């Protein structure tokens, strides 16, 4: 990616820290054929992770009334981390599956690598994360989820649904829920080998970090739990 942000984990997979370097990589080389030849699950998970940048960045920005120019620019272009992926995601996966890179795959790759990197560098640490990644970090303490090897972006895709429910973005939730089903992303706890009984530990971990320190309102454990329960009902 084009970002200067690094994520460091403990050996057991739980989050250790965020690390911002002085500058990102000087050169980024993208070969769409190489990506098309790679296992599609990595592109698939990358789409889920990238989409969170838009929802987290724009929601976090509502919690800061004094955004500077570069941060405001990052917020404005963050839609490029989600809109093209929703438009081209299913087709891009098919191109990857068939090892035939085309426009859809190229647009998605640019969203994952370039758009997200630019936004990340512009907005700084406080707007680089949010509730979806807070919940992802929460699920790192769920042993069953970890044991089944679910990918980072796969879990983040589910956590976007939590964010949208907590933030009462109902129309956007409906759209992304349908997109998630079409993409094969998780839409219920069982899809990531978790249960409602795991949520106390997950939520405690989720709210213990810095991910929602710049948010337009206080996120409470009940907000997250209620959101998960609502999503479970939709999935029935």
Q: Over which residues does each language-model region extend?
A:
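A short secondary-structure junction motif
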Residues: 54, 58-62, 92, 115, ...
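Short hydrophobic "helix-edge" motifs at membrane interfaces and signal-peptide entry regions
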Residues: 21-22, 122-124, 211
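C-terminal charged capping/lid subdomain of soluble metabolic enzymes
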Residues: 169-236
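Active-site segments that bind and position negatively charged phosphate/pyrophosphate groups
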Residues: 67-179
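A glycine/threonine-rich phosphate-anchoring loop and its flanking beta-alpha core
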Residues: 1-77
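Generic structural signal for hydrophobic core residues of well-folded globular domains
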Residues: 54, 58, 112, 142, ...
């Amino acid at each position: 990616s084009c970002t200067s942000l690094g994520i460091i984990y403990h050996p057991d997979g739980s989050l250790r820290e965020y690390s911002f370097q002085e500058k990102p990589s000087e050169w980024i080389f993208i070969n769409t054929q190489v990506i098309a030849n790679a296992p599609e699950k990595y592109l698939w998970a990358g789409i889920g992770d990238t989409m969170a940048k838009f929802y987290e960045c724009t929601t976090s920005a509502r919690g800061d009334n004094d955004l500077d120019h570069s941060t405001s620019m990052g917020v404005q272009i963050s839609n490029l981390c989600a809109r093209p992926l929703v438009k081209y995601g299913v087709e891009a996966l098919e191109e990857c599956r068939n090892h035939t890179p085309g426009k859809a795959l190229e647009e998605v790759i640019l969203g994952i690598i370039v758009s997200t990197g630019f936004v990340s560098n512009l907005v700084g640490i406080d707007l680089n994360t949010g509730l979806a990644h807070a919940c992802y970090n929460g699920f790192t303490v769920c042993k069953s989820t970890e044991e089944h090897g679910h990918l980072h972006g796969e879990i983040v895709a589910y956590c976007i649904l939590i964010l949208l429910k907590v933030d009462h973005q109902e129309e956007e939730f409906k759209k992304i829920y349908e997109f998630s089903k079409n993409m094969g992303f998780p839409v219920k706890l069982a899809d990531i080998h978790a249960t409602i009984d795991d949520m106390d530990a997950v939520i405690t971990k989720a709210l213990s970090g810095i991910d929602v320190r710049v948010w337009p309102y206080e996120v409470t454990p009940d907000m997250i739990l209620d959101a998960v329960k609502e999503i479970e009902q939709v999935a029935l």
